[in-house]
Amino acid sequence: MEVLIKNLSEADETPYDLLLLADPSREIVDDCISRGSCYKAYNIKSGIETVIGVFVLLKTRPETIEIINIAIREEYQGRGLGKWLVHQAIERAKTEKVKTIEIGTGNSSVMQLALYQKCGFRIVGVDQDFFVRHYQEEIYENGIQCRDMIRLRLDI
């Protein structure tokens, strides 16, 4: 499979179906896109481009950038593309001349926690009740209520 990364332009359709896999709040997703840079991953097959993944980078401090949304279309999951997409986000972040990349995920996001640590991120903190404070609806994954945000960091 050949995959290409492109920056989302104003003319492009926003891939809400993917962005909402990682964050169920359209309002929060819109805020993230307006403040950050959104990148789409395309599967290029027979001249047809299919969006299979997405990530959003946001510079939060002069030397820090955060991956604030990242997702792979469900039918493409389990093929190593999540790890590949995290590495693509890291490479894009490096072009911003930052020293630190951050990412956060829910306490119930077991697979994502494993993935980010395999990509070199280290747990640096827990924002207790983050999802309770910022989301009206309760979120459950893997039979666990998502309450706390686990914060991870990668020094580059």
Label each region the model flagged:
Residues 78-91, 118:
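Conserved acetyl-CoA-binding loop-helix of GNAT-fold acetyltransferases
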Residues 93-105:
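Conserved GNAT acetyl-CoA-binding A-motif
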Residues 36-38, 146-151:
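Short hydrophobic/aromatic beta-strand or adjacent loop that forms the aromatic wall/cage
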Residues 103-113, 128-134:
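Conserved beta-strand-loop-alpha-helix junction that forms the acyl-donor binding cleft
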Residues 117-125:
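Conserved acetyl-CoA-binding loop of GNAT-fold acetyltransferases
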Residues 3-75, 86-87, 155:
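Acetyl-CoA-dependent GNAT
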Residues 73-75, 79, 108:
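Active-site acidic-Proline motif in GNAT/NAT acetyltransferases
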Residues 124-148:
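Short, flexible, glycine-rich and Lys/Arg-enriched loop motifs at helix boundaries
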